[in-house]
Amino acid sequence: MKRNILILGASYGSLLATKLAMAGHDVTMTCRSATSNLINDKGTDVRIKLRDEDSHRAFLSADLPGKIHATTPDKADPAAFDMIALAMQEPQYRAPEVAALMRRIAASGKPCLSIMNMPPLPFLARIPGVNASELRSAFSCPEVWDGFEPGLMSLCSPDPQAFRPPEEEANVLHVGLPTNFKAAEFADLAHTEMLQQLADDIEVVRVDGKEVPVKLRVHDSLFTPLAKWSMLLTGNYRCITAGEPQSIRDAVHGDAELSLNVYAWVDSLAQKLGAAPQDQVPFEKYARAASSLLKPSSAARAIAAGATNIERVDRLVQALAASQGMCHPEVDRIVDLVDHRLSTQVTQAA
């Protein structure tokens, strides 16, 4: 059955949109007016390297069986879609037109799949023993999540690494690390079955007889997407320094012993919350992948560019750990450094 999916965010969201359209589903992405006009005029261009090929292939939306359309948040009607995907950075949801759309989405009762690094508060509320109200300070605008039913919110770990090449237009996305999206199930079996059907449709797509990387995997554990936390605290947030940002590779391999220690500590937090060891990704596998990540993380690049607000998974993990009687000096250092960099830039912006 063909599905109609709404995705908030047309940058990273264009990767999921392309995978869904390759499988025959229709997708509408919300974005700024200029980007919306560009996508509707020229289409999307997502570049993925197939296995055993030397260069990336460009997958153009005009060539796909499903349709990709773009619109602005104020024009999106959630009731017209089967499922909503959230693919924006957490601070972006506080923009008035996006916050208004989020209220409409919550009222629609549609299942929502987050592919954010920052797990939404309604998803955190699904984890037994977690008091989501104690975590609101980690969010730039926690109010946008207040109307959502927790069981309608799932989380999909955004493991594939992709970026907009700076020399290209905003409709282009380059996939640097084509790993899989890993989603937790919904509370309602019918919603999980819909998600699994999307995953199955993506799985069978072939191009010239070859599989296309970046699959959607559905897991019965709420904790599988949380494996990303260890990666974020070990690599992404440690790209942030007092000066220029460093690459994820250097953040991880510059002090491999400390990286392993941080990674294992975040894993232990997830397990204390209820994760099973098999929900986690072994450090060795992550370290191998990190060795090819030669750019700073998006969080580090944003701070280097003068941002006054970024996603704060570091602060979220610190707060969750404190609720479990846990702390780690390197995590505390990261949080303090990010706080300092952001507050300095807030002052400078004023």
Regions found by a protein language model. Name each.
Residues 28-82, 102:
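Conserved N-terminal Rossmann-fold NAD(P) cofactor-binding segment
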Residues 95-101, 191-201, 261-263:
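Well-ordered, non-membrane alpha-helical segments in soluble/globular domains
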Residues 1-51, 121-122, 350:
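NAD(P)+-binding Rossmann beta1-loop-alpha1 motif at the extreme N-terminus of oxidoreductases
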Residues 21-22, 106, 271, 322:
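Anion (oxyanion) recognition and catalysis
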Residues 26, 111, 276:
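Residue-level detector of anion-binding/catalytic polar loops
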Residues 166-182, 200-236, 243-350:
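NAD(P)-dependent Rossmann-like dehydrogenase/reductase catalytic/cofactor-binding core
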Residues 79, 114-230, 234-235:
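Rossmann-fold dinucleotide-binding core
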